[in-house]
Amino acid sequence: MDILSLTAVELAKAIREGRTTAVEATQVVLDRIAAAEDVYHCYVTVERDKALQQAAEVQKKIEAGELTGPLAGVPFAIKDNMCTEGTLTTCSSKILENFIPTFSAEAVLNLEKAGAVILGKTNMDEFAMGSTTETSYYGVTRNPRNPEHVPGGSSGGSAAAVAAQECFAALGSDTGGSIRQPASYCGVVGMKPTYGTVSRYGLIAYGSSLDQIGPLTKDVTDCATVLETITSHDPKDSTSMKREDTDFTSALVADVKGMKIGIPRDYFGEGLDPEVRDAVLAAAEVLKAQGAEVEEFDLSLVDYAIPTYYTIAAAEASSNLERFDGVKYGYRAQDAEDLHTMYKRSRSQGFGPEVKRRIMLGSFVLSSGYYDAYYLKALRVKALIKKAFDEAFAKYNVILGPVAPTTAPKLGSSLADPIKMYLGDIYTISINLAGLPGISVPCGTDSQGLPIGMQLIGDCFKEKTLIRAAYTYEQSVK
């Protein structure tokens, strides 16, 4: 049995049936990490001994009948902005290079309760600010589909680890597309749930009103299973929702008959690579052939999403990142003659250029004289974007479009032009602004063999509709 080629759900079944063990699966994937990390650099930290010990404990519980769930014994990777008790959590930043949390994020605890084995922490853009995983203090991650190209970001390490078979599934976070875009670039499935579905407790904040944790997996079945496992109401997160409809695996039905799918014309205009456009429209035809009703429509305000997002996210980041000052934890500059100088040097030396750029931008839009002109205006536009989606979902069950305007760019090509990098998020960020769920599903490759992702967007709390549409497409093209 080729263990590495199994999906997470298939592996858990094989462990339950005694065809392999959690320890064997963990050892196999750790050997794969040792062999492949020099090329791909998906991880910041690999907890080899801890993972094998955890796998042995999980295996005992499986054999005793105490753990019977669909992810018991499955090795997972965790994005390095989620706290993991006793394991380095750096946000891929120098300022947190020695930070070891005393607690774990709620989403990680939910995985561990289900019997998942935690392999380590994946590389990311520093503090989740970036779209290429090139702003990491710990070096770039390479795309397993072509190592000369980026894996996307900011959850690039998680997406690449799944694609490179360096884990069976991973957790990422999505503030403006940071799960869906790397999933598209690496040819895996990635889902951002409705805001408030997965607890943010233990997620080191970037943009608190936009951040959401979600799965990166090999297929849609794994995606639904992981989402079902990590979803819970959490009083420790004031934005956590109480939901009854979290049996997401019940939506794994290949049936879209009568489903109304809208394709926004605005998503297929200038700047979209023709190969991406053709692949996404071909995917829409597959769903149409399965009985879905597909039609084009106008979704206004898309052009305003980027300035709105970078105003709101930067403002929230400048506030959230104030706590990193070298006093209680993290990097502290040496030989500072007074407290103010220590703050200044610690932050100047500890944060990278992209993080500093966004902190300064956020501080500017919140400053006296500019607050009304920029920040309040952005909040008004955010409300209008939500209204535009509400109107669309009065007519359609699902909105279908591309995840990104191009396939994965070459390493180094985006950092030279931050504006170009920001424009790469044009199809994903409005979903975060509106708090909606979205999923990226592989729908082909370009002429270079680089993966293309189709994005399916749903109304609030309609993850099941998205999973049904994504599963139908996946089964139709298998």
Give a label for each model feature.
Residues 1-53, 289-291, 364:
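An N-terminal boundary/leader segment
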Residues 25-29, 308-309, 355-363:
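Short alpha-helical scaffolding segments that buttress acidic/His motifs in well-ordered protein cores
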Residues 29, 51, 79, 111, ...:
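Conserved hydrophobic/aromatic pocket- or pore-lining residues that grip, position, or stack substrates
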Residues 31, 35, 113, 164-271, ...:
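Structural helix-boundary/capping segments
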Residues 71-91, 250, 255-262, 315-386, ...:
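Short helix-loop capping/hinge segments that flank enzyme active sites or metal/cofactor-binding pockets
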Residues 71-213, 264-266, 315, 401-419:
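Short glycine/serine-rich loop/turn segments
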Residues 94, 98, 239-244, 307, ...:
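Short, surface-exposed loop/helix-turn segments at secondary-structure junctions
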